[in-house]
């Protein structure tokens, strides 16, 4: 009986997280919503506490699904992203804090401890791998075309703000919210792979398509692991935004080859 209950709890969480695939990859909202309802309903039957937390995740996913995630650098597009993505973080946070009276979702910016050699080393590895691999992916696969063409200074500035703002939001939602809620009920690696499904699905609609998941899956899993290890939002944000800085430079270079022409692995731009 205990094994059946554990399996049902895992299935409930898997249904909620798997809903991100039809919601953001296949853009089939009804299927995604059905999976969310099924996952939360199953959790209600087997573990009410889990159901409360899965409902928070489901609520955030529904909020995100109300808009297209395709990059849009217009005033209206950036405002829409800011409002909707902020709501997707604030809704679960406020409900768990003031309705559930819990303190599961937290944003631990500083740990009070200096970075370890591991942390400096990991950041260095991320920068080197990003510099070498990301040009091959974005330019070689043509995925850079999933972002608007930027040639003017104002457009480039908007792209910089947008890429970094979404990168910060990724950590607030996928790590500090989804991963933290799942971690209350499942072992670290189980919770981590479940949040990675949501993380990677979101990134797919955002533009990381073609063979992008070969990069985004390990990145999402590693970010969860690093947060679990360091307990530092500041550190995982630093890693993420360092990665995003390279992405920004590649996107600008792909549209305007004379700019940021520093990538030795960049294929010829088609």
Model regions and ranges:
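Membrane-helix interface segments
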Residues: 50-54, 152-155, 186-193, 209, ...
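Alpha-helical transmembrane segments
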Residues: 5-22, 56-63, 123-132, 192-195
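Alpha-helical transmembrane segments in multi-pass membrane proteins
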Residues: 21-99
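Membrane-embedded alpha-helical segments of multi-pass membrane proteins
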Residues: 30-41, 82-90, 156-160, 169, ...
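Functionally important transmembrane alpha-helices
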Residues: 192-196, 200-204, 208-267
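Alpha-helical transmembrane segments and their cytosolic membrane-interface
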Residues: 1-33, 158-163, 181-185
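Juxtamembrane helix-loop-helix connectors linking adjacent transmembrane helices
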Residues: 72-85, 93-166, 257-268
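Membrane-interface helix/loop boundary segments of multi-pass membrane proteins
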Residues: 111-117, 168-194, 228-232
